[in-house]
């Protein structure tokens, strides 16, 4: 044997050399299989073994800022590594076009980040995939049909007027976080639209506040789980203090939903017209088309998606108008003219042209859902030749697209006029996607726009809006939706 005729020292060196060469070969094979397919995509220089770039995303206060910086530095598409998972962020318009309009099942599966929602909203329409998602999407579309939306409009109008009364009680003082108040209004709207029952009364006040407090805990800890992968595992989560806090809050949220469902199912009458969300779900349940678990899944999803995103959008809309008095006064004058018109609120809404422009511009400037993620089941190629391999988690960055200099002139400025008919028609189809687009777009987007229009209409008629914080003082953070770390402070002065 060769090793028998060499000294112990030489034998040691040979073993070290062989080990080194085998290790190099192993590392090369790992690189070839796990890294090389993505090596052509620009990436962040600061990366660590095993954990990758995860440290740049774990901070609640800095993660959005970091991602904005990477887009400016690396271009419209770049890769980060979270543990061993490749995550590609993109605001490339051609890629948006390829992915969003596609009905190919290989592009429709949601990214792994949505798994952190499952304890809360379970396998509802937001998280489900495949045939289950297709079936549920078809079933739930009825809930947001044009004729159903007519039923919801008086509810939205009534709660918006009640919201104005709540704001008047503030007496012109600085509201420390308008989002806390808009949440309560939006929750009242979605609950009554879902059940036909107005829960905004003394009898239910404590229950609603408990629900909102628990929902705030669930939302915050869900966002924390997305930022910190070692919280992904339910086993790991249960071993930590926040795990018990999280589970307790989830139980409270589910108990609230369960009570609504029991009430709806007990009062279901097949001969009555279907006038709300739970009427339709109860009908499906009665006919055996959806089980009790499905009722829970979709009701939890509806209440979360129907109030959290809309309330945040309204809060940011009021802030943006508070920062832009010219646009605010123009919107007020339109509201004043519309208020004097004859006809129903439905007819009046059609005349709120500039108000709609301000809403769209606010959704562009501050997207409350700045990203969506898809798991690529096959390769996708850009027209410029770049390929994103299958197995990639692809994050479509709406926030970056909505501020792309190539699409929007002065993208950091609030200019509602860019959404008048002429300007809108000159932009790429998928350059403005606050509700996503294509087969997996937001099923309730028309409901959301109705709520934003009507509530803003009533607020403008009654108040002048003044933003307290300068834009430079904001600290935008991504929880489940985009918020301001210190709250959105406003001063509302009654119009005389």
Predicted regions and their residues:
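Cytochrome P450
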Residues: 2-23, 81-88, 147-158, 168-192, ...
């Amino acid at each position: 044997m060769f090793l028998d005729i060499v000294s112990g020292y030489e034998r040691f060196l040979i073993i070290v050399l062989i080990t080194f060469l085998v290790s190099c070969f192993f590392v090369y094979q790992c690189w070839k299989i796990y890294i090389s397919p993505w090596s052509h995509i620009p990436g962040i220089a600061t990366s660590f073994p095993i954990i990758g770039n995860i440290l740049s995303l774990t901070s609640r206060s800095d993660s959005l800022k970091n991602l904005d910086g990477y887009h400016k530095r690396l271009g419209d598409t770049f890769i980060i590594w979270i543990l061993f998972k490749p995550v590609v962020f993109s605001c490339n318009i051609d890629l948006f076009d390829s992915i969003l309009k596609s009905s190919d099942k290989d592009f429709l599966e949601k990214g792994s980040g949505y798994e952190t929602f499952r304890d809360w909203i379970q396998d509802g329409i937001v998280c489900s995939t495949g045939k289950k998602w297709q079936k549920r999407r078809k079933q739930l579309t009825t809930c947001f049909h044009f004729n159903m939306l007519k039923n919801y409009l008086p509810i939205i109008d009534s709660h918006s007027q009640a919201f104005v009364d709540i704001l008047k009680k503030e007496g012109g003082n600085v509201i420390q976080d308008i989002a806390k108040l808009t949440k309560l209004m939006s929750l009242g709207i979605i609950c009554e639209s879902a059940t036909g029952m107005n829960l905004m009364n003394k009898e239910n006040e404590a229950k609603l506040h408990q629900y909102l407090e628990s929902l705030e805990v669930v939302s915050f800890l869900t966002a924390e789980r997305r930022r910190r992968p070692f919280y992904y595992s339910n086993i790991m989560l249960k071993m930590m203090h926040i795990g018990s806090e999280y589970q307790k809050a989830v139980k409270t949220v589910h108990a609230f939903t369960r009570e609504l469902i029991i009430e709806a199912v007990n009062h279901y009458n097949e001969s009555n017209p279907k006038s709300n969300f739970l009427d339709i779900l109860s009908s499906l349940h009665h006919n055996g088309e959806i089980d009790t678990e499905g009722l829970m899944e979709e009701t939890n999803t509806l209440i979360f998606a129907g109030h959290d995103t809309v309330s945040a959008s309204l809060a940011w809309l009021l802030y943006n108008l508070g920062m832009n008095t010219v646009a605010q006064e123009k919107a007020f004058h339109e509201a004043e003219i519309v208020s004097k018109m004859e006809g129903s609120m439905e007819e009046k809404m059609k005349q709120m042209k500039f108000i709609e422009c301000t809403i769209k511009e606010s959704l562009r400037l501050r997207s409350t859902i700045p990203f969506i993620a898809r798991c690529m089941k096959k390769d996708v190629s850009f027209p410029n030749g770049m390929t994103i391999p299958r197995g990639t988690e692809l994050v479509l960055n709406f926030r970056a697209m909505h501020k792309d200099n190539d699409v929007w002139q002065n993208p950091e400025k609030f200019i509602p006029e860019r959404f008048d008919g002429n300007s809108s028609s000159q932009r790429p189809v998928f350059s403005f996607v606050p509700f996503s687009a294509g087969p997996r777009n937001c099923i309730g987007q028309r409901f959301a726009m109705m709520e934003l229009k009507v509530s803003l209409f009533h607020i403008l008629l009654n108040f002048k809006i003044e933003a307290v914080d300068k834009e430079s003082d904001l600290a935008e953070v991504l929880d489940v939706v985009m918020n301001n770390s210190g709250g959105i402070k406003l001063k509302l002065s009654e119009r005389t």
